Amino acid sequence: ALTEIENRSLGEAYFTRGWAHFLMAYRYGTDKQGVPFVRYEDFVNGYDNSIPPQQASVIDNYKLIIEDMENAKKRLPRFEDYDDKDLGRAHQAAAIAFQVKVYAYWAMWDETKWDEVIKLVDELETTYNRGLADTFDELFSSDFSKYWGKEYLWTIPGTGGSTGGGSEFPGVILENKGWGIYNGWGQIKPTYD
């Protein structure tokens, strides 16, 4: 039997895998060709580092992503059950919200999936108290406590301390010199000097 933290961690793993595969599937998949999808639980004797199988259709990808989000939902707590230090972690409503997004993309190939979208949005509103903010001010308030309101679904919160310009180490800014103030790659041509 899994401990509570192991169960939640497994739920987060399912959530993250589904999310990552969705990012590839909707960009590169079509009704005639899906994208590779690795399900480690399908490797009975362990992962053998072979090339992951490509799905026959993006619809097959969407089915696997929905399955991952279902598995995540079963293992994740509700948003309301998190302490302040855990806000930003995946939770049940976030898994359902991603299912909504997947079904909306799936509806491009099968219009009957809009019914699933409506059903799941209704579940988000009624069972999980997600919905639109009561006032416009709640969306753009400087009071950060309002950030976790009923419109909140899921984010990866920052830890602060950044200058807002992205990573300070591998960044490439178009500056025509070597390692300068902007850490650009530039043209860096050798000379006889």
Regions found by a protein language model. Give the residues of each.
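Aromatic-anchored glycine-rich loop motif in surface-exposed flexible loops
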Residues: A1-L87, W106
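An aromatic- and glycine-enriched ligand-binding surface/loop that stacks and positions planar moieties
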Residues: Q33-V35, Y62, M69-K73, R89-D193
